[in-house]
Regions:
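A non-catalytic alpha/beta surface segment that caps or lines the substrate-entry region
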Residues: 45-122
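Active-site-adjacent mobile loop/cap segments within catalytic or ligand-binding domains
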Residues: 54, 218-236, 285-366
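Metal-dependent peptidase/peptidase-like ectodomains
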Residues: 185-296, 304, 308
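Conserved aromatic anchor
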Residues: 382-394
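Beta-strand-rich modules
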Residues: 423-444
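Alpha-helical metal-binding/catalytic segments enriched in His/Glu/Asp
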Residues: 119, 133, 137-139, 143-192, ...
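N-terminal capping segment at the start of a domain
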Residues: 23-70, 320, 330-334, 338-340
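Extracellular fibronectin type III
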Residues: 438-470
Length: 471
């Protein structure tokens, strides 16, 4: 896997491009502050959050909003209070907002307010650049319209909400140049409405969303087939942008980019983070927007033109998803316990997934923004010229290339405060290329593939879009 490499301004100015490329393998490959975060997530905190969320009985989007002890309203109030408590502990560093919209639809037959609970930690250097982590607060049973029966939703998706609350706690006392957003969404099971609420809010506020890390079903390590795996996590990412125009698609068909959307390169970034800091957790990149025929709250972000990925456990147990609480009595399922209860959560595994998210957000928030205006030239030549626009906060840049069938970046060359480089004897036809920006203290951005297919700049959203089904 590609690793996150560190270099200093002194190295940039004192060492030639060629020498830097040769010495890349000897450059320190981690940051001490990130190394400390790797083991920081607390299983006790995660368990306490899920226990509390389960105690509200059901968190169905159409459940009670006025009770203090049951329903989605009580759950929202508790999450809001938890964020506010974390903010008090860091001297008011977090702002809590509750954007909402009213929807009707196939799974919302009457007008229903869908409210998100969002914690915002402003960046000190680049506050309009935003890194988002999401999970959904609502839960359901077998009948998606049943808002009365108990629906504990311990793994789907109290696990994701617990992870983002813990990430907010850990990062509340860390420095961040970009803004960090931690959002407990509602309305996911009824049609991804909470994701749309937050994506619309981001657009209205003019946020430059670098990514949404959507964590949904991240706490179970035992699959329905008996497979046990607490050492890997799936990261789903789209290959081409959801709102790609016909003109952009035509250009891509000639120049490539089918597997290099910003979301895909964000997945590669997360894999690199895990490889560097979490030797006991492997990122399994999945070349899909979501699981087959299913969806999640990352989809509204993609539809709005923002990069986004979905983080999900490696082996799901469908007896614990979207199920009434019951014990099987038929010949096929006698004795099987159905329902998404807390005993199905592996808290050590959830802590490792939480660490992956926390590290990714910390690294992204300290790195410069990804380069813009990346282009390549080299038709009818044996060398390739890579160009880009400089970004604020970058001390240097790194050019990457890989075989067109390779899943990860294979080669790299570090350059100083430049806006182009000529790769000698690297034929443009045979490789995919990208550029990342690097700060003076060694934090690196995701890699940007050339042109519209790989740009992290928000794509124009289509005039109208419809949400994918709930997962």
């Amino acid at each position: 896997m590609n690793r996150l490499h560190i270099f200093s301004v002194a190295m940039l100015t004192a060492i030639s491009v060629g020498a830097m490329a040769q010495s890349a393998s000897t450059v320190p490959s981690d940051q001490a502050s990130l190394q400390a975060l790797a083991s920081a997530p607390s299983e006790t905190e995660l368990r306490a959050t899920i226990t509390k969320l389960v105690s509200f009985g059901t968190r169905h989007t159409m459940s009670d909003t006025t009770s203090k002890t049951r329903g989605i309203g009580a759950a929202r109030q508790w999450v809001k209070a938890r964020f506010e408590s974390i903010s008090r502990d860091c001297g008011g560093c977090i702002e809590v907002v509750t954007p909402s919209q009213t929807f009707t639809g196939k799974r919302l037959p009457t007008p229903t307010e869908v409210m998100d609970v969002v914690a915002i930690k402003r960046g000190k250097g680049d506050p309009n650049r935003v890194i988002v982590m999401t999970g959904h607060l609502d839960s359901r049973v077998t009948d998606v319209m049943n808002s009365k029966s108990d629906a504990p939703g311990a793994n789907d998706d109290a696990s994701g909400v617990a992870a983002l609350i813990e990430a907010s706690r850990l990062l509340s006392k860390q420095d961040n140049q970009a803004t960090l957003v931690f959002a407990a969404l509602s309305g996911e099971e009824q049609g991804l409405y909470g994701g749309k609420v937050l994506a619309d809010y981001a657009v209205a506020k003019g946020w430059q969303v670098e990514t949404d890390l959507n964590n949904d079903i991240v706490g179970n390590s035992r699959g329905q087939n008996g497979a046990i795996d607490n050492t890997s996590v799936r990261v789903f990412s789209e290959g081409t942008k959801s709102n790609e125009t016909a003109t952009q698609a035509t250009a891509r068909s000639y120049h490539g980019g089918e597997v290099d959307s910003p979301s895909r390169n964000m997945a590669r970034y997360m894999a690199s983070v895990a490889d560097t800091y979490l030797p006991d957790l492997r990122v399994h990149m999945i070349y899909r927007t979501d699981r087959y025929g299913r969806g999640g709250d990352q989809v509204p972000f993609l539809q709005a033109g923002f990069p986004a990925v979905r983080v999900t456990e490696s082996h799901e147990d469908y007896t614990h998803q979207h199920q009434d609480l019951r014990t099987g009595t038929s010949d096929k399922d006698r004795g099987v316990r159905y329902g998404d209860t807390i005993d199905g959560v592996d808290f050590h595994y959830l802590a490792r997934v939480t660490a992956l998210n926390t590290l990714t957000m910390a690294a992204l928030s300290r790195a410069p923004a990804p380069p813009t205006g990346v282009t390549i030239e080299g038709a009818l030549a044996t060398d390739t010229t890579v160009k880009w626009n400089k970004v604020a906060g970058a001390a240097g840049y790194r050019v990457h290339w890989r075989d067109t069938t390779a899943p990860q970046w294979q080669h790299q060359q570090s350059v100083g405060d430049e806006d182009h480089v000529v790769l000698k004897d690297v034929v443009i036809d045979d490789w995919f290329f990208g550029v990342s920006s690097v700060s003076a203290d060694g934090y690196e951005s995701p890699v940007v593939f050339p042109g519209d297919p790989g740009s992290f700049t928000r794509s124009p959203a289509p005039a109208s879009s419809s949400s994918a089904p709930g997962h």
